[in-house]
Amino acid sequence: MSFFLTTPTAIDLGVNIDHVATLRNARGTAYPDPVRAALAAEDAGADAITLHLREDRRHIVDADVRTLRPRVKTRMNLECAVTPEMLDIACEIRPHDACLVPEKRSELTTEGGLDVVGHFDAVRAACKQLADAGVRVSLFIDPDEAQIRAAHETGAPVIELHTGRYADAHDAAEQQREFERIATGVDAGIALGLKVNAGHGLHYTNVQAIAALPGIAELNIGHAIVAHAVFVGWDNAVREMKAIMVAARVAALHGGR
């Protein structure tokens, strides 16, 4: 049995603070402070703090990562590309988790999962470099059987399944097909002994079905929480998301009762 398997009732929320930094950088100010947002999110029930240090530093910057690392009380999940610069930073900072993601400068946000099959040697080397530095590695991948198998073969103990196509589905039938791909991917990851997380594009009205899947350990959500906070406040936005996730998981385990 994998060390990472948890009880079916447990589901964690990783709050992504990237778009707090986006708001700050829109006017070149020192506020809102993403580090302050991270600490407040922890107080409101977040189980981890996720942040993506992109090569172009469009939102999170190096100082955010360095300032947050000694102050985080839960876990820091640093998303980064498979490049020498980013791997060196991750090995220096030593977050609790490093999630390797694909990255293109032209994209508004991450558009798909990391192609582990096509870049296997580079990804495997990155996993070893991070593991040697004491950092747990996660791979952000599409819910594809070949990618999941390749992720396992790299030695990474965690995968995060890309839920963007589910979130962006144009109709209910397409969304159901994407949900079934995710559910199958969760089962495949669990069967290989991997910890399975998920995220991308999830919000307050589409997260329920994903949170109900008992094999998922953690959901990473950011933009929706930042947007909802405009209306209800940051603390409430975090608490509401966590409550929705937990309620969906409990209802699924008890047959909707």
Swiss-Prot record:
* EC number of this enzyme: 2.6.99.2
Please verify whether the record's keywords include Protein transport: no
Q: Which GO terms describe its cellular component?
A: cytosol
Instruction: From the UniProt record, give one GO term of the biological process aspect.
Output: pyridoxine biosynthetic process
Q: Which catalytic residues are annotated?
A: 52 (proton acceptor), 79 (proton acceptor), 200 (proton donor)
Coarsely, its chief localization is cytoplasm
Record pathway = Cofactor biosynthesis; pyridoxine 5'-phosphate biosynthesis; pyridoxine 5'-phosphate from D-erythrose 4-phosphate: step 5/5
Binding residues annotated for 3-amino-2-oxopropyl phosphate, in chain numbering: 16, 27, 201, 222-223
Binding locations of 1-deoxy-D-xylulose 5-phosphate:
18-19, 54, 59, 109
Function summary:
Catalyzes the complicated ring closure reaction between the two acyclic compounds 1-deoxy-D-xylulose-5-phosphate (DXP) and 3-amino-2-oxopropyl phosphate (1-amino-acetone-3-phosphate or AAP) to form pyridoxine 5'-phosphate (PNP) and inorganic phosphate.
Q: How does it assemble?
A: Homooctamer; tetramer of dimers.
This chain belongs to the protein called Pyridoxine 5'-phosphate synthase
